[in-house]
Amino acid sequence: MRFAGMSCDDERPANMFDLMAPQLASTSCNEHYFSTADLGASTLYATTTDAPATIAGILTPQPATLAPMYSTCPVRFDDQRSAPASTSVSGKRKHSDVEKDRRRSISNGFAVLQNVLHNESNAKPISKSILLQQACDEIRELRKKLDASTTIISRFGLENLFVPTPSSTHASPPNASSRIYSPINQASDVLADTRRASISTSATPILYSEEKRKANAKRRHSYDGSWQASDRGSIDDEASASASASASASSSASCSSSSHTHSDDTDCDDTDTDIPAESALKERTKRHKARSKKERDRTKPRYRPKPSTNRSPTPSSCASSTPNSPPTSSNRNRDLQQAILSLLLELPSHLEDVKNKRRASQPTELADPSSVKSRSKKRHR
C-alpha cells in the first residue's frame, strides 16, 4: 500500500496506515481518509465534496507533500496577538475605576466635613470652596485659642512647672526624643498626669493614723453605755501610752543628766519620773469622769458609716504617686488629646477668673451694707 506524499518506488509496511489512523481520527477535523481495497488501487477517497484524487496524480514521480491532505483540517490554536489588547483594555478599565473611587472618596470626605461643621445629617449640599473656607476658619480659631493659652502660660511664668522630669514613671512614647516640648505639650502632659493622680487617689480611701483608727473601731461596737466604756478605755489607753512615752523620755533625760553630773553613780532612779506621769493620768481620768452624759453624747458622732473591708494599708501619697498600670503609647496619645481639649475648653473660664482676680485686687468702692446683710441672710438660710 502506498501513501500520498510518498514516491512510487518507496515501499512502507502495510500497517503504517493503521498506526497513523488513530492520530488522524483524534484531531478536531471531521474529515477522515481511508483506503478502499475493493478498487484494487491506492486511491484515496475523502468524505468531503472534493473530487477524488486520480491515480496519475498519485503515481507521479515527483514527491507529493502532505500539505493538501492536512489543509482540509483547520488548525485551532489560541491567538496570542489578542492578549496585549485585552490587557490594555482591562488596564484602562482599572484606571477608570480607580479614578471613580478617588472622586467618590473625595465627595464622601466633603460630605463628612459638612456634617462635622454644620452638625446636620440632612443639610443641603454646600460647594467645596465654602466647605474648605469654613474648615480653614475653624483651624484659625483653634490656632488663636492655642496662642492664647501659650500667652497665659508665659504671662504667669508657668514654663518651669511644665518641664518634664527624667524620673517619670510613665512609659515614654517611641518618638519622645523627636517631640518638641512646647508649653502646650507640657501643659497637656501635666493635665494628663493630674487626671491620673486624681483617679488613683479617688479609688483609695482616706487613711487615718493608727491610733484614730483603733479608737473609731472601738467606738463602732454599740450605741449605748458600752460605747462610753470603750471610749473611756481607749482614752485610758491613749493616756497610758502617752504617759509611758513621757516617762521614758524623762527617765532617759534624767539618766543622761546624772551621768554628766555624777559620773560615780551607776544606778538611775526612776521613782521621781513616775510621780508626774501618774498624776497627769489621774487628772485626765478625773476630767473625763466629771463630764456629764449630755456632753459625752454631744461629742458622739450621729452617723457612723460601716468600716470598709477593702482598705489598703498603703498611704494615699504612695498610691497617688504610682499609677495602677503603666499606660501604653495609645493610651498616652488618647490622654494627650483629651488634655488638649480640656485645656481649650478651660481657657475662657480661666480668662474670666484672671479678670475677676484683677478686678478684686484693684481698690473698689464699698458696697451698700444693707445689700451685704441681705446676702448674708440668704446664705444662712
Swiss-Prot record:
* Residue ranges of domain bHLH in the record: 90-142
Q: Where is this region: Basic motif?
A: 90-103
Q: Which UniProt keywords apply?
A: Nucleus, Transcription, Transcription regulation
Primary residence: nucleus
Question: What CDD domains is this protein classified in?
Answer: bHLH_ScINO2_like (cd11388)
Please name the SMART domains in this protein's record: HLH
Biased amino acid composition, Acidic residues: 266-275
Q: What happens when the gene is disrupted?
A: Abolishes the production of itaconic acid.
Chain spans, region Disordered: 81-103, 212-337, 353-381
Question: What molecular function does GO assign, one term?
Answer: protein dimerization activity
Where would you find this protein in the cell?
A: Nucleus
What does this gene product do?
A: Transcription factor that specifically regulates the expression of the gene cluster that mediates the biosynthesis of itaconic acid and 2-hydroxyparaconate.
Q: What is this protein called?
A: Regulator of itaconic acid biosynthesis
Species for this entry: Mycosarcoma maydis
Tell me the lineage of the source organism.
Eukaryota, Fungi, Dikarya, Basidiomycota, Ustilaginomycotina
